[in-house]
């Protein structure tokens, strides 16, 4: 099967290598000329994922060349670039390929999920791939399980057949809204978990953050039409666990730096790659206001990131809130 992967960051590189191992004809598209020259000459992508890139994977900066005759096109760019790449795809698309989206985020200007943005430009079936999946582990063939979601289950089944092997297991879920929100909103809680680590707090604090974070993710998700059970699956609690606990998580690492006293700008500069939770915090905070959903952790992380609130004060605000029943609002 011919499959195009658009975006040569960590995840795009990893999924291209994974699919190449399965015997597919893979084209990896990127637009950075320097990165293109580096990969072509060294077969390494040093900044993002410094592993051998097989010679069988075609590398190109020509989008039309990349997608021509492809049966599946994988969008593996950061969420803020999904609109631009979708618009360009519309201009060059030559057949009704399946779109697989890997980006986890909510567009800040429109508050739309990534599949909604893509559907503005393309009539193709869109399949969302989400779940606990560090690129660094997938490329090393560490056993990983993720979830696929689409309005068309048959499209999910095509992707499931094409992407699965003994090290990469994929389940199908019809709840597109829940799968996308779970993958996006957990990054906010991961920032909080990192801030907690940076402040020197312990496992009790992190467990509370993750559990109560899942509660507010579920509240917003249900308000937006999700099945609450989705958040107990791979795209919810699964992704939340890995992102809040692993040092491979950019969101957690950025949070640690902020907890240790660095500004948001300093933390992002040190990470050197996109930290999706930053923009998602803006989007989720606005959605919580619009839909009148109680999201206290998101509110405090927003205050730390964008209003200069001291993290210790944010923790105090959370711990001294009015008394509640645990399942309040769910």
Swiss-Prot record:
Family recorded in the similarity comment: Belongs to the NAD-dependent glycerol-3-phosphate dehydrogenase family.
Recorded catalytic activity of this chain's protein: sn-glycerol 3-phosphate + NAD(+) = dihydroxyacetone phosphate + NADH + H(+); sn-glycerol 3-phosphate + NADP(+) = dihydroxyacetone phosphate + NADPH + H(+)
GO biological process, one term: phospholipid biosynthetic process
Record's function text: Catalyzes the reduction of the glycolytic intermediate dihydroxyacetone phosphate (DHAP) to sn-glycerol 3-phosphate (G3P), the key precursor for phospholipid synthesis.
Entry GO CC: cytosol
Name of the molecule in the record: Glycerol-3-phosphate dehydrogenase [NAD(P)+]
Signal peptide: none
Residues engaged in binding NADPH: 10-11, 31, 104, 135, 250, 274, 276
Catalytic activity, EC: 1.1.1.94
Localization: Cytoplasm
Molecular function GO terms recorded: glycerol-3-phosphate dehydrogenase [NAD(P)+] activity; NAD binding
Pfam families: NAD_Gly3P_dh_C (PF07479), NAD_Gly3P_dh_N (PF01210)
Pathway: Membrane lipid metabolism; glycerophospholipid metabolism
Organism: Thermoanaerobacter sp. (strain X514)
UniProt-annotated binding residues for sn-glycerol 3-phosphate: 104, 131, 133, 186, 239, 249-251
SUPFAM superfamilies for the chain: 6-phosphogluconate dehydrogenase C-terminal domain-like, NAD(P)-binding Rossmann-fold domains
Active site location: 186 (proton acceptor)
Enzyme kind, highest EC tier: oxidoreductase
Keyword terms, alphabetized: Cytoplasm, Lipid biosynthesis, Lipid metabolism, NAD, NADP, Nucleotide-binding, Oxidoreductase, Phospholipid biosynthesis, Phospholipid metabolism
